[in-house]
């Protein structure tokens, strides 16, 4: 059921996701899609939610942006994703970063990992793609008593007249079925998901940051999104990309562009 308090129709977004394959975007995804920034990991450590030596599972890990950040904090991390091309890119990025992460092909709803094996389970920028009740149940199964779940987002913010709003309008012209426009980066329904899975001590946190993008990088970031190369064929993606390049030159010529983003998370603890 759609949550009327939520800015995006997450049911429609998940239905749209049935035709999305991020594996098709793996190169752009790894090169241009900004991962969670340092402010996100600082938030986790400042709140005492992570610590060296903990065991973590990162669901829907993609190219490893959250997993790598956790590994850099001294956690033992396993990343789970259904798209093997993204895991291949993640391993390349790990080598460059000098961290070691275990990756397994699987889904958030059925990871195949042992029960009560994780101190921390994370899901970054992906919860809306899952069968949420099943994924939340899997989170509870994976956590040790006292373990913590963190569902996080790093969303661009479409504001009147800004490049994000113009880009979203262009995506919709090329892909009218895309359900990801108009977001605020806040997802209150995720708290209900965690509560229904038995987690308590629920909290949210957020911080707004600006992410710099050149024209080339923004085009790559948008190609890597669900509404473009992950769901359009190569020819339609190329046409879209050319129009976006022209739009940026015409309406947003200054580089780098400052793209407003919101870090937002929901977290809860499995009772001991």
Describe the predicted segments one by one.
Residues 125:
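Short catalytic micro-motifs in class I SAM-dependent methyltransferases
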């Amino acid at each position: 059921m759609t949550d009327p308090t939520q800015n995006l129709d997450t049911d429609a977004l998940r239905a749209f996701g049935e035709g999305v394959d991020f594996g098709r975007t793996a190169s752009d995804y790894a090169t241009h899609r900004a991962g969670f920034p340092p402010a996100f990991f600082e938030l986790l450590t400042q709140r005492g939610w992570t610590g060296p030596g903990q065991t973590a599972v990162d669901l829907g890990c993609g190219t490893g942006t959250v997993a790598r950040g956790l590994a850099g904090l001294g956690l033992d991390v396993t990343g789970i994703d259904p798209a093997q091309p993204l895991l291949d890119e993640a391993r390349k990025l790990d080598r460059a970063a000098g961290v070691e992460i275990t990756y397994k092909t699987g889904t958030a709803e059925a990871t195949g990992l042992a029960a009560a094996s994780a101190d921390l389970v994370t899901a970054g920028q992906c919860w809306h793609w899952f069968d949420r009740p099943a994924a939340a149940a899997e989170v509870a199964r994976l956590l040790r008593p006292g373990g913590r779940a963190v569902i996080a987002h790093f969303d661009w913010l479409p504001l009147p007249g800004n490049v994000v709003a113009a880009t979203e309008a262009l995506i919709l012209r090329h892909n009218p079925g895309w359900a990801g426009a108009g977001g605020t980066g806040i997802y209150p329904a995720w708290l209900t998901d965690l509560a229904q899975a038995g987690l308590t001590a629920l909290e949210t946190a957020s911080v707004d940051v600006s992410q710099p993008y050149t024209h080339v990088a923004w085009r790559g970031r948008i190609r890597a999104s669900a509404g473009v190369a992950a769901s359009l064929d190569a020819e339609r993606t190329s046409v879209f990309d050319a129009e976006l390049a022209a739009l940026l030159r015409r309406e947003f010529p200054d580089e780098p562009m400052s793209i407003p983003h919101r870090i937002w998370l929901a977290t809860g603890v499995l009772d001991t």
